[in-house]
């Protein structure tokens, strides 16, 4: 597949004429002009001088406006549409970067520099590697902007003379990575050739590694760590000489997936069993030596991260993190919360009837298999063997749960729910399903199309072990911990 942005066009885009055109296009979009009108404007077309530059500048302007919602330096950064879609939320990137404090860090699959900008604030020295040269060019520009704001050294044009070094190459072949702007091919024995010269700056042995591999297979996202690009088992094998690794994964990954527990690491990627320097590295640890952290931002489960070596939280096997959203508390009290599981999951809570309160546990804790621990601490029981829903008789106030008073438990039939609604004066209604194969919109029509909206009455259709019920809860009187 051809790159979204060629290196030649990227170099023009980061030049003063390219940046000025992106500023003009962004201002025109801000003023309400549409993309077609801008793209056919004679002065814009002349400034771009060719169709590829024009398309890149317009795409960068559109992406910049979208990036403003999350990125502090959006009005100076340069994105492609795809790169922006793939970029981590800056709040999450900053959380990840905390583990790399004052370290020499190699950021693989670095894209246009979103994660690297966060690492720039914590690392002592930073090396980035990106296979797509066009993206690497944008990354150097974006990191220069970030470095200026942070008042740290700016990315060097070649290796060896700056706090940040930007390289072009494959995450599984760091010996072949070349500094950005070096010639693509370097003769053996010359500076930058494999085995000598500046390329040694891109090694990962004894360093801390950060990598956010591609998680798309065709046009679909994958939860399977064996299908990422590069695959997780290949990354662990190739960089087993690293002091520690952080590999960003899809939020639905299983913490006990074989690729994360030592299986499938004999893939032939040219790595020695003990790393490039002969020392035992992250790939040689018993039981995989991996902590899988599930990160939730506000009410949304964002990602999982596999941590190895010195980056692992002691003996943690799985952990859950609640991050508050910058524009709202999101985690109950606006603070960061963490829970850690250091061994096998604890015993499941007993199954019981629907109590006075229905309790939902934060998705990050559920993925980390910590919901039963939370239930035990709060004195709650399960409603079904294969549901993470909990229940009890008192409203818990805990950052890891959302709890709602139960108003009624009735049959999960539209007629029964419609009859209950006729007998009770209620505000807006929200319909949610828990394991029940029902289309909420169809169910809403079948119960008489009551007013819809959040923070009112919730009709919770729950699949239990032997039947399904409709649990009517009062969201307005509930506790919203996350």
Task: Please identify what each model-predicted range represents.
Residues 1-482:
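SAM-dependent transferase fold signal centered on methyltransferase-like domains
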